[in-house]
């Protein structure tokens, strides 16, 4: 899922089954894979004339995630909500309608919002990493929607987040699940690998170990996740076909739509993880 034919290798830990990219690209070189044509930065505009229809789907996903925050964290006016790897910050935009909290987004590039600064002007968006948040900043809710698999130093990140959190802070993470049905089906073409941007691929066992090691206690692991599992499946199919992700997806819309209907009917009664998982954790009491 990148603009070159370069091959990348993943290895698996025999003890905890953590999958990791080795060798990893130097961070400077990695920037070439996060340009403004990167699909999450392009957002719904990647779908051309079907942008509005896809926007409705994205809005539904953002609302679903906001409702999870409401269910487990009860945000209020005094709450600080931090979205790490915010990309195109539509999730925070939805949170601004749901809650009267202070909303913060951080990403190492502004490619996700620089073209729509007026739209997102009420959000506190920052280019940088978590070390640039400041020692006095304390989030009540932290979300990492498909961020942690990109992080070169997840131990450091989670430990840092625990250090700036309060006793009531809740952490929400969503990542591809290596133990999922779609990974077993597509193997090396699985979109969850997303080389070379994804450096770690987690499963329920090792992500709980990782969180516990760095100051967090897992409350819930939802093996269904919030992202529609069809998205990962469709992207895997497109990987096999060699789709150029930098081009417009307008011509793929109806293929995507009809495929989704068939997928939904086929997987109507599936209870196993089909692609992603959501983890909710709280700060460990010392």
Where are these regions (language model features)?
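Phosphate-binding active sites in nucleotide-utilizing proteins
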Residues: 150
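Short, glycine-/aromatic-enriched active-site segment of Class I SAM-dependent methyltransferases
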Residues: 173-200, 205-210, 234-237
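Short, P/G- and charge-enriched loop/turn segments at secondary-structure junctions
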Residues: 263-271
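Conserved catalytic loop of SAM-dependent methyltransferase domains
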Residues: 219-247
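A short glycine-rich, Lys/Arg-flanked "PGG" loop and its adjoining helix->strand segment in the class I
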Residues: 155-170
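A SAM-dependent methyltransferase catalytic signature shared across enzymes that methylate proteins
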Residues: 205-224
